[in-house]
Amino acid sequence: MAFASLIERQRIRLLLALLFGACGTLAFSPYDVWPAAIISLMGLQALTFNRRPLQSAAIGFCWGFGLFGSGINWVYVSIATFGGMPGPVNIFLVVLLAAYLSLYTGLFAGVLSRLWPKTTWLRVAIAAPALWQVTEFLRGWVLTGFPWLQFGYSQIDGPLKGLAPIMGVEAINFLLMMVSGLLALALVKRNWRPLVVAVVLFALPFPLRYIQWFTPQPEKTIQVSMVQGDIPQSLKWDGDQLLNTLKIYYNATAPLMGKSSLIIWPESAITDLEINQQPFLKALDGELRDKGSSLVTGIVDARLNKQNRYDTYNTIITLGKGAPYSYESADRYNKNHLVPFGEFVPLESILRPLAPFFDLPMSSFSRGPYIQPPLSLNGIQLTAAICYEIILGEQVRDNFRPDTDYLLTISNDAWFGKSIGPWQHFQMARMRALELARPLLRSTNNGITAVIGPQGEIQAMIPQFTREVLTTNVTPTTGLTPYARTGNWPLWVLTALFGFAAVLMSLRARKH
């Protein structure tokens, strides 16, 4: 009785919401405790039972603050190290980001309790998953979006991973919310029926993991080398270090020419404008072609636009076997989805003078097109994504082609030091390989550099914070997963059906 009385207090529920939210961080890499996702979502649903809408919204906000406060506090590393602002301001900015993201979980909980106030199957199994899909979409879209810490990623090695090639990671989010709600209902109502349904729903997708949606092409196996330069972020954009950086990458690459078919350098490995490096690029291109190798590298490009101003791009270019390198070559990729404050500054004229954090090196990039052709290197087709873009499943899928041999992502996570951020980023990259059934080549400045197999498994990787080269044989695959064919459309149809049914059944219940 004492516990029951205690749990009814709103303050206790707010505290528990913080704890359940923080627990959710354990579901993601590097911890990879996937049951924590279910426990965290169970807590969110159970704590909002029998609460007024504003009370539920507060619980949802606190739950989100626990999740994002613990799960994305790694942004503090870059702000504190490179932001040039006092410590309290750095902490405030991290808290502000966590609070902003928590608005969406607060919105979910508040609307759920407003429209479906009764603790029923309708609320937990039909309304909650549909509403969660909508609020998670908003979190990934409003103000360019930040779809980090979606619980579907926790299943990259879990029982539900077989759902990803069929309907994508967001479908796993949907099912996790449904299962968690049913478990919460079973616990609160002390009823075994929701428990049985939850177990059945959770078990049904398990056999899907054994379906192979791809066909390996062993005759097209190539040796790939990815150079991890481990250039400190504090030195990366120092002009005096440019020559040394080029030497590091060239010296690591020279022994690989003629041995590895494909050599990959990470995001902005060449820390200079492409136009300034024409002699170096043409000489390197000639050497690569003479020895029969191809190279992909990140670089910065600036092009004169129609307004007679320069647009600066975060770019991938190709060198080596095939047609000679040309600055006018269309075989390049320009990053489309830019990171706020890292690659562009909103309200630039106001914010840039305020603090160094708003005036970081290379924070005035322009966007490339949303859809871009694959990179083509001597018959190898690469669907590319730079850094943050790899977490955008729908965008990667929209750029994917049936003849894609590999997914490619290059990144620089040196901004975030030894935090958990790079591991979360890596986990999300693995999901793209699973969704599209293609090997993924991930080349980074200081880790995590790895080759991911077409089922999301880690085939090869090298340690973080080392100057090293990952060399391994990689076999491309062919075939289209259902998700590659349809994207998120089936899930949105399901969301619409669930939402319509939930509203209709709620209206009928109120009439009676």
From Swiss-Prot:
Q: Which Pfam families match?
A: CN_hydrolase (PF00795), LNT_N (PF20154)
Task: Give the pathway listed in the UniProt entry for this protein.
Answer: Protein modification; lipoprotein biosynthesis (N-acyl transfer)
Q: What is the effect of changing residue 314 to A?
A: Cannot rescue growth of a lnt mutant
Name the consequence of residue 415 to A: Cannot rescue growth of a lnt mutant
Q: What is the effect of changing residue 148 to A?
A: Cannot rescue growth of a lnt mutant
Instruction: Give, from the UniProt record, the effect of changing residue 387 to A.
Output: Cannot rescue growth of a lnt mutant
Enzyme's top EC category: transferase
Altering residue 237 to A: what's the impact? Cannot rescue growth of a lnt mutant
Q: Which InterPro entries match?
A: Apolipo_AcylTrfase, C-N_Hydrolase, C-N_Hydrolase_sf, LNT_N
Active-site residues (renumbered): 267 (proton acceptor), 335, 387 (nucleophile)
A GO MF term: N-acyltransferase activity
Where's the CN hydrolase domain? 227-476
EC number annotated for this UniProt entry: 2.3.1.269
| Family to which this protein belongs | Belongs to the CN hydrolase family. Apolipoprotein N-acyltransferase subfamily.
Annotated protein name in UniProt: Apolipoprotein N-acyltransferase
Q: Could you tell me which species this protein originates from?
A: Escherichia coli O6:H1 (strain CFT073 / ATCC 700928 / UPEC)
Q: Which gene encodes it?
A: lnt
